[in-house]
Structure formats: structure tokens, C-alpha cells
Amino acid sequence: MPTSSVCGVKQTGCTMIKSYSKHWACLFPQHGPGRKHQRKIELAPWQEVIVREYPGEFARGLFHSDGWRGVNRVHRRLADGDHWYEYSRYQFSNKSADILRLCGEALDRLGVAWRFSRRDVISVARRGAVARLDEFVGPKY
């Protein structure tokens, strides 16, 4: 797109690229009118190739935009007193079934165990799965 201006902005841990053009919808067909969870989100063939080759980077982008990594604290009352258990987990939330499907497919390619904790939330809570996802996602800056 020779007529659109592009600029790069250095940020901690990444470089943010900005560009404004009315032709982005031609290159990225999933962008369109209406809410994303009310229309079909479908990757173009060239995007599918990239997502298949780089599922870790794709998952990182998804979790950095619509996900979080936190620590759950669970309280149990036992005969010998109260016990607290803590464990790390990831959650990814999105109203679009298509985006949730794409996220799940990327996690499957990475060998990360996941499940739906709600209709619109993907949960990664098993210790090994969280450790595996940590290799790709990392902290938000």
C-alpha cells in the first residue's frame, strides 16, 4: 500500500507498527462492519499459513490482547485446619466463537491442555500446560 503512511514506535519488549488505510479490509477480510462476535471471523489463506507455522506467537498475541495470567487461591477446610492452595492459570475471554476456535486450535498445536470454563472463556490451569504456555506468552508490557 504505497499511499498509506507507516510508522514504528519502540516499546518495552516490542515494536508497535501503526498504519492507517481504507484498504486494510481488502488485506484482512475478517475486518468488516458490525461486531466481531456477530459475524464470521475467517482467516485468509496466507494468514492460515502463518498461524499454522507460528502458533506460539499467535497464542501470545491472543492472550496479550484478550487474556490474563493470574494466581488462583483455593480455600479448603480440613479436620486439621484451614488450607490454602495456590496455582497459576491463564484465561482467554472472547465473545466470538470463531476466535475461541482459533485460540483452541493454536493451543492444541502447542500441546497445551485447555478447556472452556464458561461459554466464552478458555482456561489453562494444569501445571504442565501453564508452564508450556509460559514458554510462548510471557509477561505483558
Summary of predicted features, one role per range:
Residues 1-141:
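Internal intein/HINT superfamily modules and their associated LAGLIDADG
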